[in-house]
Amino acid sequence: MVAEVDSMPAASSVKKPFVLRSKMGKWCRHCFPCCRGSGKSNVGTSGDQDDSTMKTLRSKMGKWCCHCFPCCRGSGKSNVGTSGDHDDSAMKTLRSKMGKWCCHCFPCCRGSGKSNVGAWGDYDDSAFVEPRYHVRREDLDKLHRAAWWGKVARKDLIVMLRDTDVNKQDKQKRTALHLASANGNSGVVKLLLDRRCQLNVLDNKKRTALTKAVQCQEDECALMLLEHGTDPNIPDEYGNTTLHYAIYNEDKLMAKALLLYGADIESKNKHGLTPLLLGVHEQKQQVVKFLIKKKANLNALDRYGRTALILAVCCGSASIVSLLLEQNIDVSSQDLSGQTAREYAVSSHHHVICQLLSDYKEKQMLKISSENSNPEQDLKLTSEEESQRFKGSENSQPEKMSQEPEINKDGDREVEEEMKKHESNNVGLLENLSNGVTAGNGDDGLIPQRKSRTPENQQFPDNESEEYHRICELVSDYKEKQMPKYSSENSNPEQDLKLTSEEESQRLKGSENGQPEKRSQEPEINKDGDRELENFMAIEEMKKHGSTHVGFPENLTNGATAGNGDDGLIPPRKSRTPESQQFPDTENEEYHSDEQNDTQKQFCEEQNTGILHDEILIHEEKQIEVVEKMNSELSLSCKKEKDFLHENSTLREEIAMLRLELDTMKHQSQLRKKKYLEDIESVKKKNDNLLKALQLNELTMDDDTAVLVIDNGSGMCKAGFAGDDAPRAVFPSIVGRPRQQGMMGGMHQKESYVGKEAQSKRGILTLKYPMEHGIITNWDDMEKIWHHTFYNELRVAPEEHPILLTEAPLNPKANREKMTQIMFETFNTPAMYVAIQAMLSLYTSGRTTGIVMDSGDGVTHTVPIYDGNALPHATLRLDLAGRELTDYLMKILTERGYRFTTMAEREIVRDIKEKLCYVALDFEQEMAMAASSSSLEKSYELPDGQVITIGNEWFRCPEALFQPCFLGMESCGIHETTFNSIMKSDVDIRKDLYTNTVLSGGTTMYPGMAHRMQKEIAALAPSMLKIRIIAPPKRKYSVWVGGSILASLSTFQQMWISKQEYDESGPSIVHRKCF
């Protein structure tokens, strides 16, 4: 990145500090704009540094120029200051300091993959590099190579799996399932899963096969592993789960499948990254959007306390930042260093992100302010206020208004200007009026009683009538303009009207009685109104008596000064004094003048009363109009309020309906989703059935398909493949369960043990045989034996092979149907066939006609067969076989002094019987020899080292087959049973039966059995008939060998029962096709 100067030492004298060099080599040219290729630095380009000592390296670092380190040079933000300011420290300390250079010196490398020396919270992606295995052929065995390459034929792979442990691990702890899953060999994965291999095995990096399948994007293998129950939440050595790798690969379908199978969406790796934080850190916008829809935690923190928003800002991804802001994420959260997302955006010069954060903050502030001023609450308050106002108007409760309408103020100003305008033209009359108004001593502005009469007060202008009319109009206009003002100041016009009427009535009453009323206080507006009314009344009186100039001012003055009351009316005069009146020269004239004045006075009072009444009515009408107008306005506002409330309730109902529709849509979507899932399941089942049908067709068309042959004996189970000479698996048909619960946690004690494993642990187990006398009595244990046969002994999948089963003659029909049902429904076999054991034994000897005496561990049968067909009416059954002989030997050994009581000890006695016992040709003679000599005695060493001696017991035990009375049974011996079976057959075939008597079963393996049978049957049969006893050397397995021969025939495919036939007819089809 940066070039070297001439002062750099030679390359041969340098040592390579490889960690620092690898970090320095990954810084990009954007962080070193001026030093790249220049002579200002001693450090060369990426990977081109020479080896030097620590001192030389520090001297180089000190010569980096200030242009490449604008803020750290000489500041406290970096531990690498100016040239020569370095401390002497080890390489480790220097590396730790270099990791602390601030983001201003490394603007583009911070938080990105270009540098390993970024911010203090950067992560490495070594866990996601090179997902596939590095495989060398010499490190893998045969099975692992087949699993990795997947180019092995299916048959060969099946054979390989049969002989190899499917869970075997190589040097790197990889199983075959790991390799097949990582390389996408779905066929091999399916075979391994069918063999029930272990699913959660970890390789050297603690990854399961599912983790490798997801990491390598092998979706088909991953889905198969999920369906078989692999845990998707097992972390590897980096702490990553399968969901982390799916998110890193931007595989939304796989991520969705993992979540459906229980993957933890909030799991964290060793860096504290959840799948969402990993997607943000790697700038995977689509999967981030997917995880947000899946309700991933947006406030999750990594190990440095950083949220998804801070990581998105550090990565410079404006699109992810915008996506997160749409989810109302907290933008004020801080990491462990105390920095917020905005501070990171500013320090990294991400202007677009800064703008996004600013816009988001403004929207949040607007949202908060709009929530504080809730329109619905304002509507409610407005409605309540209007209701209170309307209620207050009805209850006559006046309200105070903070402001008057501007028009009222303008009206007042106009009236005052008009009055001033007319004052200059009506000086004389207004002076008289003003003198009359202000002459009294009261301070209420009303007209007091006149004290003196002067000629100056009786002077009027010539144009009296014109002035009078002008003044009347002026006063009338002024009153009309003042009336709305008075009504606006009072919030209850009806009450004011009522009070005004009452006051006027009181005034009239007071004027009649000559008693004026006094008021303690009154608003200024009432005082002004009284003055105007008084002036108006004076003008009206002047109009009535316009011809007499003296009377008008006299009456006006007398009316104004008659009393000191504040009601504004004109009371009558109470007294006449000589000082206040001028009399004429003669007494008669004085009398007539006084009478005329009294009459005139009375008439004026009546006129004043009528005028006042008319004015009151006019005032009432105007007030009523004002009240009606206000009521109309109130009714209009109430109507608007009701309309608004109705509209609000309608909107609420619509919102409720929308919510109900939304809930209904959600419910319908859930039902559709459930239906889709059910459809998917049904389709999967149909596909599985089709696959099984295809497999069955392949098996039918392929002549080389191996048929499994299983001989279910009462004591031993023999199993193998058709065409083989001998069975591959022979084990006791026995199931053992622990007698007591295991006390040690590490013993891995099973619930049950089968076959040889059960026999080897018989000391701590309770052993049971699921078959008694050739009939299955415990189907659960029998199913365990079959499962053990398929998966542990033969290591095959039963759903891939047809099966031939054997059964004893005279088996109940219900047992056959149950056996058929288990094979098709539990083990999903494609086809099966059931054959009688005696017939298969005859096939082994190469005959189709003869009589088979089959004696095993639980039962003995004699079955006559002619041309391959058994004769059921001549078939006989004897419940005397090897198990009864074992019990008899235990009894006679106990009589000898040896104690055998438990099930485990019984197995020891069975081993003695099979190894030492034989059939005596002449039982009486043998008994005599044993009694006279000890040469017939034999020794047997028990498992504990004890040696027991056996005398005549070793031939007395098999003698019970010929003399059942030894066991307390009243039945015939095996020789008589064979003879009786022949005699029940047709006469024409008896000769063939005598000459083809075949011995079969493990109980017939005693030495001397064939000779004794020849002797006993010859003694019973007619002398002219030839008796021939056939005893094959491998008659212990003759039933299984006969089944192998039958299943290998080309016509066997036409004999078996297919899965399709079973589905159509049920278990009862076994009687029609097999018997």
UniProtKB/Swiss-Prot annotation:
Q: Which residue ranges are recorded for the region named Actin-like?
A: 703-1075
Task: Return one GO MF term.
Answer: structural constituent of postsynaptic actin cytoskeleton
Single GO biological process annotation from the record: cell motility
Signal peptide as annotated in the record: none
Is GTP-binding among the key words of this record? no
Q: Name one GO cellular component term.
A: extracellular space
Q: Is Repeat found in the keyword set?
A: yes
Where are stretches of biased composition, namely Polar residues?
485-494
Pfam families cross-referenced by the UniProt entry: Actin (PF00022), Ank_2 (PF12796), CCDC144C (PF14915)
Q: Where is the composition biased (Basic and acidic residues)?
A: 377-392, 401-424, 466-483, 495-530
Report the SUPFAM superfamilies cross-referenced here: Actin-like ATPase domain, Ankyrin repeat
Which residues does the annotated region (Disordered) include? Answer: 369-530, 544-597
Mind telling me which InterPro entries this protein's record contains?
A: Actin, Actin/actin-like_CS, Actin_CS, Ankyrin_rpt, Ankyrin_rpt-contain_sf, ATPase_NBD, CC144C-like_CC_dom
Instruction: State the UniProt keywords alphabetically.
Output: ANK repeat, Coiled coil, Repeat
Q: Which residues form a coiled coil?
A: 413-436, 642-698
Write down the SMART domains for this protein, in alphabetical order: ACTIN, ANK
ANK repeat ranges, renumbered to this chain: 172-201, 205-234, 238-267, 271-300, 304-333
Of which family is this protein a member?
A: In the N-terminal section; belongs to the POTE family.
Put simply, this protein is called POTE ankyrin domain family member I
Source organism per UniProt:
Homo sapiens
| Organism phylogeny | Eukaryota, Metazoa, Chordata, Craniata, Vertebrata
